[in-house]
Amino acid sequence: MKSGRFIGVMSGTSLDGVDVVLAAIDETMVAQQASLTWPIPVHLKKGILDICQGQPLTLSQLGQLDTQLGRLFAQAVNALLAQQRLQPRDIVAIGCHGQTVWHEPTGEAPHTLQIGDNNHIVAHTGITVVGDFRRRDIALGGQGAPLVPAFHHALLGHPTEKRMVLNIGGIANLSLLFPGQAVRGYDTGPGNMLMDAWIWRQCAQPYDKDAAWAKEGQVILPLLQKMLRDPYFAASAPKSTGREYFNYGWLERHLTAFPGADARDVQATLAELTAVSIAQQVLLNGGCERLMVCGGGSRNPLVMARLAALLPGIEVSTTDKAGISGDDMEALAFAWLAWRTLAGLPGNLPSVTGATEASVLGAIYPANPITQS
């Protein structure tokens, strides 16, 4: 069974940077050793957003973006290697999620697309890459997401305590870790995505630092109620979503009935939408003893405060309190998934995704042995 140092690479729907994490992994442990966040250039971010918003593009443009992202991921990995004074031969493999540009797991031909050419990562790092984790699950009738609940269970499951793990990235997803029950999990709806999109359009800021802008506003209750009537929130699990659904266009359509709304009030309402839509799902599943939060949204004091207020009797804390950085959780999960793939172990949970069976996930892009010598 493959064990040793693995690198996880994650570029999520928030587009707030490429998260890269180094971890020692075997069948008994996942020990994080180092991490960094690598910036995404503005032109690449724009290209990704254009695709996710349904803007037309040529196959040449898509191919160029695929190549550029692969090179960017390689740069991020090499920066971590240099920081830690490591050589390619010191790393067993890289687990790279890629950048989701479209996720449509239902319909006549379900599909999901992550770009960032893994061949370029191998070529520029000299390290074996495991990627394309989601499409096997979709081929087996699953949603292809979320994949992190299996990792949450491995690291944070408890024999007696009823726990949930909440990841607030661009999209928020919930993992239900109940003793004696199959792990369940799904996307609850928007996490940071709409808040980030609004402040970017209004203030040219990538995110609302410390929720300072949202705190200046007041929740527009009719707008909140209108958004919460979106059918996604009432749909039953398994379910997953992404930027192709909850995007700036979605927000604009809801705002047409509220001309002249104060921009700060809209930001406050979007923060409340994230908190309320999550809290509703926590309660719908019977609540828990501890809600452990990770992802960029765990650093949003307004969202965290609202979750605590909406969920009395539940301990709401970040995964940092359990010794796992909330900023690195997803990248760490894909390092772990790479280890499972190389070990021939399944990476999905049918109880989460709805797939017909558990399966080894991903595709392996082997490094040239000469570069690893």
Swiss-Prot record:
Provide one Gene Ontology biological process annotation: 1,6-anhydro-N-acetyl-beta-muramic acid catabolic process
Q: Where does ATP bind?
A: 12-19
**Any GO MF annotation of the entry:** phosphotransferase activity, alcohol group as acceptor
Provide this UniProt record's keywords sorted from A to Z. ATP-binding, Carbohydrate metabolism, Kinase, Nucleotide-binding, Transferase
* Functional pathway: Amino-sugar metabolism; 1,6-anhydro-N-acetylmuramate degradation; Cell wall biogenesis; peptidoglycan recycling
Reactions catalysed according to its record: 1,6-anhydro-N-acetyl-beta-muramate + ATP + H2O = N-acetyl-D-muramate 6-phosphate + ADP + H(+)
Tell me what this protein is called: Anhydro-N-acetylmuramic acid kinase
Gene giving rise to this polypeptide = anmK
